[in-house]
Amino acid sequence: MKTQSHAIVTLAFLLTFGAASAQTKWDLPTAYPASNFHTENIVAFAAEVDKATGGKLKIQVHANASLFKAPEIKRAVQGGQAQLGEMLWVNYENEDALFGIDGVPFLATSYGEAMKLWRASRKSLEAHLEKQGLRVLFSVPWPPQGIYSKRTINSVADMKGLKWRAYSPATARIAELVGAQPITIQAAEVTQALATGAIDSMMTSGATGYDTKVYETVKNFYDTQAWLPKNVVIVNQKAFDALDKSAQSAVLKAAAAAETRGWTTSEEKTGWYLDQLRKNGMNVAAPSPTLKADMRKIGDAMLADWLKKSGGEGKAVVDAYRKM
């Protein structure tokens, strides 16, 4: 009996150990809060992968820069410290000019235009990341960008001297062009930076404004709808290749669904975010004709600069986009 019992226990152990060893666990850091629609979409993506693989691939989402800060995420995925990660394309424009294409003011100002720009640029962007051992899974836009300011702004002249949050090379360049002071502040630090007076203005979406409770310290939002920057979820190519074919298929299928869902949610929530800002006492308004014209001139100058930096490849992407 003892021999039989030992055999049963040993078999049970082997079965349990085998199941455990067959399970793969991945970490996915993101810089945004758990309540943000991007993060919620990523959590849904992870759940779909878990279900499709029968629990063999578990993806742990680390929100609000709890595992890596925004500027660290891409390198962490490249180095295998995290298997996946979410990054903002425009944050890496200094590394690769093409990454800044959706941060050029007024190049694409609606969801329809943003989708055309993504279709025109996707293959090139994917190829650039592939050279770094990274694979694009899905990319989702933020709502259109507008100007938050403690100061009333009727023209670019009113922006001189503002302490301007810069989250990307493009937003830093805007600050320089309008005579503001660019200050690098990550999304997770915005609330504190506004409360302490480290910054008094920024250009970002209604979503970020709502998430960071900008309305507690800032009263003006000018809905310039200047551009729709995208986040992208990337995976370490070696980690992806280590999966069996069925798991790879599950990841890609869930990623395609997440991209479709993310674009729909982003567009659907755009108006809702602005309504929440209004309900919390903010003045949400269209830019004055003068401010709009001034910002368009800045956009034209920045597009010319970007085309010089990105060379023939950048021009080809913009030309393809404009023909769509």
Regions found by a protein language model. Name each.
Residues 1-9:
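Bacterial N-terminal signal peptides that target proteins for export
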Residues 23-113, 121-324:
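N-terminal secretory/targeting leader peptides
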Residues 8-18:
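Bacterial N-terminal signal peptides
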Residues 116:
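Short beta-strand-centered segments that line the small-molecule binding cleft or hinge
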